[in-house]
């Protein structure tokens, strides 16, 4: 009976805490727009933080399927599917590549949307980094999932262009794939 009281007291103590703290990896709109010069480096670092997970599959998606790399034998690694030309839909490495790519695109696009240009040269330089990151990600996504540009860029399918996060994610429409030229 004593253990039940102790557990009940511990449960009440845990639930009754009124301290509200935001996760360290998130920034609310008020903090972001109140002082852009202080919040911009943190937001941009968030983009680069996603690239840590993204960079490993980035070069593998492009190089393993080509003839630049030769691996002898077999492997159980998910990227071995690229070398053997047998991709499966549940390849977790491809899923991570796709997910983190669009996380970088969303973060960079939201920064571009929320922070005005022309405020200072430092802000414009950092906005340029956001434009670059978004373009670089689309390039690598198109390289991994799209058709070659040299064949027919007007009709070859590229990637869905999603610049930002939707205001209403529940009713958001998924975009069509754009062409490689777009």
Locate predicted features.
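Membrane-proximal, proline-rich intrinsically disordered regions
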Residues: 17-62
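Secretory-pathway/luminal and periplasmic proteins that interact with or process carbohydrate-rich
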Residues: 52-57, 71, 137-148
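Conserved, well-structured interaction surfaces
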Residues: 79-146, 174-178
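Bacterial Sec-dependent N-terminal signal peptides
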Residues: 1-26
